[in-house]
Design a protein with these regions (language model features):
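Transmembrane alpha-helical segments in integral membrane proteins
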Residues: 31-56, 173-182
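Membrane-interface elements of multi-pass transporters and channels
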Residues: 1-6, 50, 54, 58-59, ...
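C-terminal membrane module of polytopic membrane proteins
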Residues: 130-194
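Juxtamembrane helix-loop-helix connectors linking adjacent transmembrane helices
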Residues: 1-40, 58-73, 77-80, 189, ...
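Membrane-interface helix/loop boundary segments of multi-pass membrane proteins
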Residues: 43-87, 114-121
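Juxtamembrane helix-entry segments on the extracytoplasmic side of multipass membrane proteins
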Residues: 25-31, 102-104, 156-162
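Hydrophobic alpha-helical transmembrane segments
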Residues: 30, 34, 82-87, 102-103, ...
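Functionally important transmembrane alpha-helices
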Residues: 86-157
Length: 194
């Protein structure tokens, strides 16, 4: 049945990830940062935010840009991008074939999509995606080198350490609010000066 297939996919992804992450040398860390942080950040953001989200918005790919100029090509007034953001976020999460983490990954994909809309720069979601993946790679690397119990490392943010997840979520929400507010104020001051 479907549930068994999902469990099998989840377990396969976990085994593959652990095989990649099971390094304790600086060279291995650098390779993992390239393969598991930098390349996915660039490739997935180009695909899901740079292409799919734009297609869902009905925009041509001709005006796609990695440059953050003073005038963003994305306008909340011109189009309502919410549907495009959420469609690309759902696909982003589904393509990872890790169903038990579907909702958090979908929310992260939506955050990346909104950051693209708010800033007009694909570099912001790429940087955020890289930072997220790099932090996981670095945590795993340090945990292995220090001999930490990997079961406890994997459980960070759940059960006994649920408070860490809550604190992280609150900090993230405050950061998003502050970032969005600064973008809005910056746009308002640029309109006033013109």
């Amino acid at each position: 049945p479907l549930e068994q297939w999902m469990k099998t996919q989840e377990e396969s992804a976990k085994i593959l990830t652990e095989q990649f992450m099971n390094v304790t040398t600086i060279g291995g860390l650098i390779i993992n940062l390239l393969l598991m942080a930098l390349l996915p950040a660039i490739a997935e953001e180009l695909t899901f935010r740079g292409v799919l989200q734009r297609l869902f918005e009905g925009k041509s790919l001709e005006d796609a840009s990695l440059q953050n100029g003073s005038k963003a090509p994305y306008s909340l007034k011109a189009r309502i991008p919410h549907l495009a953001i959420w469609c690309s976020a759902i696909l982003f999460s589904a393509i990872h074939m890790q169903f038990y983490g579907f909702v958090p990954r979908m929310l992260m994909g939506a955050l990346f999509g909104y950051m693209l809309v708010w800033t007009g720069s694909l570099w912001i979601p790429i940087l955020m995606h890289f930072t997220n993946n790099a932090m996981a790679v670095l945590l795993y690397f340090v945990a292995l080198r220090q001999g930490w119990d990997m079961e406890k490392v994997d459980a960070i943010g759940t059960n006994d350490t649920l408070w860490l997840g809550v604190v992280s979520m609150v900090i993230t929400i405050i950061g998003i609010y502050a970032f969005r507010r600064s973008i809005t104020m910056s746009n308002a001051s640029s309109r006033m000066s013109n």
